[in-house]
Amino acid sequence: METVLYIAVFGALGCLSRYYLSGWVYELFGRAFPYGTFAVNIVGAFCIGLIMEFSLRSALVSPQLRIGLTIGFLGGLTTFSTFSYETFRLLEDGELLIASANVLFSVMTCLVFTWLGIIVAKAL
């Protein structure tokens, strides 16, 4: 039951974080490209690398906390479904170049940021 509580609490925090972070990014950069979704997914990619690597090396992160942070918080923060929908809408609007850039940049950047999170965790 403790694990479920961690997931629920951190999930709510992750959802709220996505709402505010993506909204802020859209205010800064506009909506010509799905910048808000891109930003939350990059942050999530970095955090999953950091959390998973750190939790494997340290007893400071309990299994329940790790699950709460990754499944709960990062599950609420990141969004593959919105990424898919926004990319589909770009394709539907004839924006093949922007849609392709979104797929390429999102996947490659998230992989790089996951790796950076792992590097940072190893340095801690």
UniProtKB/Swiss-Prot annotation:
It catalyses: fluoride(in) = fluoride(out). The chain crosses the membrane at residues 4-24, 32-52, 67-87, 101-121. GO terms for cellular component: plasma membrane. GO terms for molecular function: fluoride channel activity; metal ion binding. Fluoride-specific ion channel. Important for reducing fluoride concentration in the cell, thus reducing its toxicity. It is found in: Cell inner membrane. Belongs to the fluoride channel Fluc/FEX (TC 1.A.43) family. GO terms for biological process: cellular detoxification of fluoride. It comes from the Bacteria. This is Fluoride-specific ion channel FluC. Keywords: Cell inner membrane, Cell membrane, Ion channel, Ion transport, Membrane, Metal-binding, Sodium, Transmembrane, Transmembrane helix, Transport. The gene is fluC. It is a multi-pass membrane protein. Na(+) is not transported, but it plays an essential structural role and its presence is essential for fluoride channel function. Its main location: membrane. InterPro entries: FluC (IPR003691). Na(+) binds at G75, T78. Pfam families: CRCB (PF02537).
